[in-house]
Design a protein with these regions (language model features):
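Bacterial N-terminal signal peptides that target proteins for export
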Residues: 2-21
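Boundary at the C-terminal end of the N-terminal hydrophobic targeting segment
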Residues: 32-34
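PEST-like low-complexity, intrinsically disordered acidic/proline/serine-rich tracts
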Residues: 36-383
Length: 383
């Protein structure tokens, strides 16, 4: 059972949650910063804005609160305040209906470096409700009932079909940061220290660059749409986009293929099962050409045929990139672990390797194409 908190329920629900002391949160990784656009904002310049909600643009990769702020001189300024991606807000129970047009609100955040009509929304207080952080949860969700979920398909393969997502990273009050949802109580009680929690895996993996790889990584402009594909509504890589920022992805097992629908940018990837070899003439693409086979209960996926791109900013790759992924289901915990290894002789001399784990998703997969509204990332819209 799941109870969403919307509209009139907002104030009542918020009053049941402890107040949040103002604090500057430590960002999890460079990759997280890149997505949330903190390069545009100055954390040394906190802002507190009082005014009226005009609406919300509930989109990926950044949602925006439209807000009429009233200054000390009584004049009104139309503000745009950046929030999290719609996909991530939805997982936390946020809905557009919470932001009632005309409602009084206070926004706490950080000033834009160049645009006085823009801000980064860190906390918000709507009406009489307590102040809430951008990463807070607005839904109460009981554990997903998996008792009737078959561990295998009729054909015998492990049942990896369905909707999957990395565990949410949420606020641990008093800890000054985000932690995996299942550790919140332990962190708040002092049983577990934030510094002892493994990273989210959203950032680049350690790798030894070639001379070219190092030069291009050093020159990479994190906040430039020309360099960073996420800032121009393009996926980054099949490695990063599987977990970065906690999207809900869908796997569909078919007779001769496995289809993965990635949640944050709504693109489809096809894995051709039991194809002996890649075709000779592959048209290079973002996702490459993937073939897979089962080694016991492990799905092994081999992918080549990439167009040059970015593995995880600032690590770039060439059309010689070769990725091998191994997906293994734990039918007792209902987790899906992926180990991956990437090789590219043009950009690095060793292997770019890592592992991640996703859970049965807490909300259904929902196609939600990218709609970048940040003016700085839309150069064609500028006069």
């Amino acid at each position: 059972m799941k109870a969403r908190i919307v509209a009139a329920d907002f104030v009542q629900f918020a009053h049941r949650i402890r107040g949040f002391a103002a604090a500057t949160l430590l960002c999890i990784s460079t990759a997280a910063l890149a997505h949330h656009g903190m390069g545009l904002y100055d954390r040394s310049k906190p802002v507190e804005l009082h005014g009226v909600i005009r609406g919300i643009d509930f989109v990926n990769p950044h949602s925006y609160l439209r807000f009429d702020a009233t200054g000390a001189d009584g004049k009104t300024v139309a503000m745009r305040c950046e929030m999290r991606a719609a996909t991530l807000l939805r997982r936390s129970g946020w809905t557009p209906e919470m932001f009632v047009t005309g409602a009084q609100a206070t926004v706490y955040g950080f000033a834009h470096r160049d645009d006085p009509t823009a801000c980064y929304l860190e906390d918000i207080k709507i009406g009489d409700a307590p102040r809430m952080n951008r990463n807070d949860q607005f839904e109460v969700t009981s554990k997903t009932d998996l008792s009737n979920r078959p561990a295998r398909l009729p054909s015998g393969e492990p049942n990896i079909s369905g909707d999957w997502a990395q565990e949410q990273w949420v606020i641990a009050r008093g800890a000054g940061g985000l932690v995996p949802k299942h550790l919140v109580a332990d962190v708040e009680s002092g049983k577990v220290a934030v510094k002892d929690i493994p990273p989210s895996g959203w950032g680049p993996r350690p790798v030894t660059f070639t001379a070219r790889g190092k030069a291009e990584a050093d020159a990479f402009r994190m906040w430039s749409p020309e360099d960073n594909p996420r800032l121009r509504c393009r996926p980054t890589s099949i490695i990063l986009d599987w977990i970065f920022d906690g999207p809900v992805n869908r796997i569909t097992q078919q007779k001769d293929r496995i289809v993965i629908d990635y949640g944050l940018f709504s693109f489809e990837r096809v894995i051709y099962v039991n194809m002996a070899a890649h075709p000779k003439n592959i048209t290079p693409s973002y996702a490459g050409h993937s073939i897979g086979h089962w080694e016991g209960d492990v799905l092994v996926v081999d992918t080549i045929g990439f167009e040059p791109g970015v593995l995880a900013a600032p690590v770039k790759h060439s059309d010689q990139l070769h990725v091998v992924e191994r997906f293994k289901l734990d039918p007792k915990a209902w987790t899906l672990t992926r180990d991956y290894v990437a090789e590219d002789p043009v950009y690095f001399t060793d292997k770019y390797a890592g592992s991640d784990t996703v859970l049965v998703a807490d909300v259904p997969y929902e196609p939600r194409p990218c709609s970048e509204l940040t003016p700085e990332f839309r150069p064609n819209d500028k006069p």
